[in-house]
């Protein structure tokens, strides 16, 4: 088991962990008003860049 040789300061520990944060997911809103991921078809209406790209079952 690895054991540290010297104590790491709070500052150095914080600098090491500075890149460990969770990225906030990017959200854009479709013309229908639903949130969706950028560069992907809208899961609710099936449009992408103003075109219908997937079939949607309207029940």
From Swiss-Prot:
Region entry Disordered, spans: 1-20
Pfam families for this protein: Ribosomal_L32p
InterPro entries xref list: Ribosomal_bL32, Ribosomal_bL32_bact, Ribosomal_zn-bd
Keyword Ribosomal protein: yes
GO cellular component, one term: large ribosomal subunit
SUPFAM superfamilies: Zn-binding ribosomal proteins
GO molecular function: structural constituent of ribosome
Name of the featured protein: Large ribosomal subunit protein bL32
UniProt source species: Nitratidesulfovibrio vulgaris (strain ATCC 29579 / DSM 644 / CCUG 34227 / NCIMB 8303 / VKM B-1760 / Hildenborough)
């Amino acid at each position: 088991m690895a054991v540290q040789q010297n104590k790491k300061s709070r500052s150095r520990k914080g600098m090491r962990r500075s890149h460990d944060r969770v990225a906030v997911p990017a959200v854009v809103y479709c013309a229908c008003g639903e949130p969706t991921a950028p560069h992907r078809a809208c899961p609710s209406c099936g449009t992408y860049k103003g075109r219908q790209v997937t079939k949607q079952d309207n029940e």
